[in-house]
UniProtKB/Swiss-Prot annotation:
Region forming the signal peptide: 1-18
Alphabetized UniProt keyword annotations: Aminopeptidase, Disulfide bond, Glycoprotein, Hydrolase, Metal-binding, Protease, Secreted, Signal, Zinc, Zymogen
Organism (species): Pyrenophora teres f. teres (strain 0-1)
Protein name per its UniProtKB record: Leucine aminopeptidase 1
Disulphide-bonded residues: C322-C326
Binding site for Zn(2+) 1: H188, D207, D273
Transcription regulation recorded as keyword: no
Cofactors required: Zn(2+)
EC number(s) on file: 3.4.11.-
GO terms, biological process: proteolysis
One Gene Ontology cellular component: extracellular region
Record Pfam families: Peptidase_M28
InterPro entries per UniProt: M28_fam (IPR045175), Peptidase_M28 (IPR007484)
Length: 389
């Protein structure tokens, strides 16, 4: 996800360890890195129309300074094609209406499932998108999604890897409805250690292991609905796990560029990036809440999500901002699709251990992640049966 303030002592310790174990570090580099032909410089977009050529090291330095961007080196066409559907024309329900139907489903959400998945997901040395570990973690995640569909008997549903030239694939699970109008639920699967991405550990428990397992659990329970399972929902639902978010929203850009070219009719996209950290909120004396992002998002979809949280979650929301290109919903927006983003807290209280070796499970609240899962499940179900024009 976006860069949080990284702690200098963590860098110093990492540098000392790297220097002391130089030979071991070289071995890790050789094991992790894939053979990938990379350009000398990358074209990044820091705000609409503001572009710059930078080296890879300069990309990471920008991230350390909390500066986000699209890497548009290979995705310059995203957002340039005319689409048949105007995102501004999408109208969302005036209020949630499936309270009674969702009540028993919400009870099926299990934080123990999220913990078990996250324990394995964070056991990979890193999920850096250009590493062999990143390839392995993506393959493991694909297997978990396949198992989720198989266990549910979801014969109409499917899942596929969306390959990328850097090695780590994105993943797309599709639950067909009665129309091609599509609701997308997303999270990113990669992690990064911004000090030495190629070889330092990046457990990525919160960023974005938490979002990854949150939407996986929402998918599992959504498939307990007979109507969803039988393809009787009005709209198609997709769950996306993006590769290479940390490199400049690369995986989501590739997917939404392909959707734009195919004139795919995406009615809504919700990103879940960092769903588990609450300690800074509590330390500040503030009530536990979820953070609804209000900048660079679709206002209509965001307003409906606020209603979803009010009805289906046990904690309130706060309104907050995260800036341009701060997570994968920005790729959907750039393609002309209405998107939204809900994070774990007010942005100023979000996890500052991300992108380091300290982004660990022990700092997360699975009760809080359960609230994100409730919101995700409820939104997916409500919009699956929404009547869009």
């Amino acid at each position: 996800m976006k860069s949080a303030a990284l702690l200098l002592p963590l860098y110093a310790a990492a540098f000392a360890a790297a220097a002391f174990h130089h030979e071991h570090a070289q071995a890790v580099i050789q094991e992790q890195q894939l053979t990938i032909v990379e350009p000398d410089e990358y074209l990044i977009e820091l705000s609409p129309g503001e572009t710059r050529w930078v080296t890879e090291n300069e990309k990471w330095e920008l991230r350390k300074k909390n500066i986000n961007f699209f890497d548009i080196t290979h995705n310059a066409e995203l957002g340039t094609l005319k689409r048949r559907i105007n995102a501004a024309s999408v109208e969302y329900p005036s209020k949630p209406v499936f309270n009674e139907t969702l009540a028993p489903l919400l009870k099926e959400l299990d934080k123990n499932n999220m913990r078990a998945h996250l324990e394995t997901f964070t056991s990979f040395h890193t999920r850096y998108y250009k590493s062999q570990y990143g390839v392995q973690s993506s393959a493991w995640l694909l297997d978990q999604v396949k198992k989720t569909l198989a266990d549910a008997g979801a014969s109409k549903a499917s899942v596929k890897a969306f390959p990328h030239p850097w090695g780590q694939s994105s993943i797309i699970a599709t639950i067909p409805g009665k129309s091609d109008k599509t609701i997308v639920i997303g999270a990113h699967q990669d992690s990064i250690n911004l000090f030495f991405p190629a070889f330092l550990a990046a457990p990525g428990a919160d960023d974005d292991g938490s979002g990854t397992v949150t939407i996986l659990e929402a998918l599992r329970v959504l498939l307990k609905s007979d109507e969803i399972l039988k393809g009787e929902a009005d709209n198609t639902i997709e769950f996306h796990w993006y590769s290479a978010e940390e490199g400049g929203l690369l995986g989501s850009q590739a997917i939404f560029q392909s959707y734009e070219k195919e004139a795919r009719d995406v009615k809504a996209m919700l990103q879940q990036d960092m769903t588990g950290y609450v300690q800074k909120t509590l330390d500040a004396g503030e009530p536990e809440s979820v953070g609804v992002i209000t900048d660079f998002v679709d206002p209509g979809l965001t307003e409906f999500i606020k209603k979803i949280i009010t009805v289906y979650c046990d904690i309130p929301y706060v309104l907050t901002k995260c800036g341009y290109a701060c997570s994968d919903h920005a790729s959907a927006s750039k393609a002309g699709y209405p998107s939204a983003f809900v994070i774990e807290s007010d942005f100023k209280y979000s996890d500052n251990k991300i992108h380091t070796t300290e982004d660990k499970i022990e700092y997360l609240s699975f009760d809080h992640m359960l609230q994100h899962a409730r919101m995700t499940l409820a939104l997916a179900y409500e919009l699956a049966f929404a009547e869009f024009k």
